[in-house]
Structures are given as structure tokens and as C-alpha cells.
Design a protein with these regions (language model features):
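Catalytic DNA-binding helix-loop module of base-excision-repair DNA glycosylases/AP lyases
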Residues: 35, 107-151
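Alpha-helix N-cap/helix-initiation sites
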Residues: 41-45, 123, 140, 160
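Residue-identity detector for glycine
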Residues: 56, 77, 120, 143-146, ...
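Alpha-helix capping at helix-to-loop junctions
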Residues: 91-99, 117-120, 131, 135, ...
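Structural signal for membrane-spanning alpha-helices in multi-pass inner-membrane proteins
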Residues: 131, 153, 183-186
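C-terminal end-helix/capping segment
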Residues: 144-159, 164-168
């Protein structure tokens, strides 16, 4: 899959990633992505669990999220900005601004353009949705600090243009390359 010697070592060290199409739960995935922005996995999981608890056992509908008082959502541990972003995503579903069937057929760049129109969804979040929700095979997220750190650690590259050039050599499997680079940071041994 990769001619890159660094990635070849990582492929031998870690099990193959299992990317699953999770687009059936697109609202859930977007909300989870927003809550996870700029947080550790543990903190994000805690806040997300508190958020889910507000609605009982079943994940809320966009309408239920819009009906909930902002302060109740804030009490889960979200900033005012994140509460606003969560409501913005819910509103995009209620107003049918998000058409999942259409998004699934769009190019990666068109998906990014469409999703980033929604307050709170930037390029990084859209790229994570492409990789982990829509199972797109060839996404490289230069905006991801973890990926940049892994590239710096494993390749000694700090220049963004050089990182992009390196990632070009991983086409058409850049999503898989990203996954292995993330794993390299999680497991020090």
C-alpha cells in the first residue's frame, strides 16, 4: 500500500484501520465532532456523555436540541461558542440545509465547502467527517495538530509545504496514512 518506509513500519506495528460508513448518524457525528474540537479525548467523551444524558437513552433529534435551554447544554461543560455551534448544526438539519444523500455524492472539496457554511464547522471538522463518517479514502488534514506532530516526529519535517508534498506520495490512501500517524502518537512503545 505504501512505499514510504516510515508508514511501512507503522502498518506492520498496528492493526489495519476499520473505517465504517457512519453517515446514517450524520447529525450525531457532527455534534460529536463539534464537542471534540480542541479537547482531549477524555474531556470530549465526558462532555458528550453529559450532553446525551440530557435527552435520556436515545440521542436527540435536531428539534430536541433546538428546544433545550442553552444553559442546560452549557452545564455539560461546553463553552457558549460550542453551545451556539451545536444549535447551528441542529438548525441546519431542521431547515434542511444539510442533505446527507447529496453530501454522500459530493467531492471531498464540495463537502468541505458545504459543511463549512455552518457556524462552528471549520475545515478540520469537515475533514474529520470525511474520514470517519463518510469513509473517504484520500483525505489529509494539514490542520490537525496531531498529524503535524507525528510528521515532525517521524520525518523531521516542520514546513507545511513539505508536509503537503510528503502526503501527496500517500495518494490515494491519505486517510489511512493519517490513521497510522495518529496511532504512532498514542502508543509510545
Amino acid at each position: 500500500m505504501f512505499n514510504d518506509p516510515v508508514l511501512k513500519k507503522l502498518v506492520k506495528k498496528y492493526p489495519a484501520p476499520k473505517f465504517e460508513d457512519r453517515s446514517a448518524n450524520f447529525f450525531y457525528e457532527l455534534i460529536e465532532s463539534i464537542i471534540s474540537q480542541q479537547l482531549s479525548i477524555k474531556a470530549a467523551d465526558t462532555i458528550f456523555a453529559r450532553f446525551q444524558t440530557l435527552f435520556g437513552k436515545k440521542f436527540p433529534t435536531p428539534t430536541q436540541v433546538l428546544a433545550l435551554d442553552d444553559e442546560k447544554i452549557r452545564a455539560c461543560g461546553m463553552s457558549y461558542a460550542k453551545v451556539s455551534y451545536v444549535k447551528s448544526v441542529a438548525n441546519a438539519f431542521v431547515s434542511e440545509l444539510i442533505d446527507v444523500a447529496k453530501i454522500k455524492k459530493q467531492s471531498d472539496e464540495d463537502v468541505i465547502a458545504e459543511l463549512t457554511q455552518i457556524k462552528g464547522i471549520g475545515r478540520w471538522t469537515a475533514e474529520m467527517i470525511l474520514i470517519f463518517t463518510l469513509k473517504r479514502p484520500d483525505v489529509f488534514s494539514l490542520g490537525d495538530l496531531g498529524l503535524r506532530n507525528a510528521i515532525t516526529k517521524l520525518y523531521g519535517i516542520t514546513d507545511r509545504k513539505q508536509m503537503i508534498a510528503l502526503a501527496e506520495t500517500w495518494k490515494p490512501y491519505r486517510s489511512t496514512a493519517c490513521w497510522y500517524l495518529w496511532r504512532s502518537l498514542e502508543n509510545k512503545g
